[in-house]
Amino acid sequence: ARATERPNETALRFDSGHTLSFAEAWRQANALAIQIQRLGVTAGATLTFQLPNVPESVPVAIAASICGLVINPVVPIYRGKELGFILNDAKSEILFIPHRIRGFDYVDMITSLRPSLPHLRHVICCGAEEDLSDDVLRYETLMTDAPSDLAAVTNVDPNDTKVILYTSGTTGNPKAVRHSHNTLAKALDNGVDAWQLGEDDMMLMPSPVTHVTGYVNGIELPFFTECKVLLMESWVV
């Protein structure tokens, strides 16, 4: 609705200086949803993304909802042990990762894990810094090659699982926590009411969008309310 009512209004800002309007966020999400559907990932499957607070994270999350997928955000600090467990436990079919963050190579990590991930069919790298192997797709290529058609929107039950988040696994393997469309919407509504947020407000969100705080109040907030968001990608202490 926001993309129609206020298409050119900025929905999200990033500390890189990049911005996303409501219309541009929807356009990118629609294009990505078409490509996900073309890859054969169908409603009810799990999509995992292990991205920092970068512009690509927003259309990835929205596209997953368009396709009726279960969204599985994973914080970027997790390494092979945690990521491998989560991907298998969630039976994730499609994964979005960065190439490198602070010198760590996520493509190398998933390449070493892939033989032990029977459910994982597609890996998409955002911001690839060099040539990739044939079994890793470039996010930018998917977006460039996407048609301008409208993606088929999947109708879901509000009580269906929308997001699976995993605990840190301090005392063992990470534990899955399921949220339905209804429970996430209620959490968002409660926050907006308590904070009395309106169209003149902007929320600074330093929490990762792959954590429940950052996901709800970073990605979803502008599209369900009139409040805008500034996503902080990183900070130095």
Feature names for model-found ranges:
Residues T19-E24, K162-K186:
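Conserved AMP-binding A3 loop
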Residues P7-N8, C125, E130, T144-Y166, ...:
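Conserved pre-ATP/AMP-binding loop-to-beta segment of ANL
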Residues A185-M202, T210-V237:
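Conserved AMP-binding/adenylation subdomain of ANL enzymes
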Residues A45-T46, P52-N72, P76-G80, N88-I94, ...:
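A short helix-loop-beta submotif of the ANL/AMP-binding
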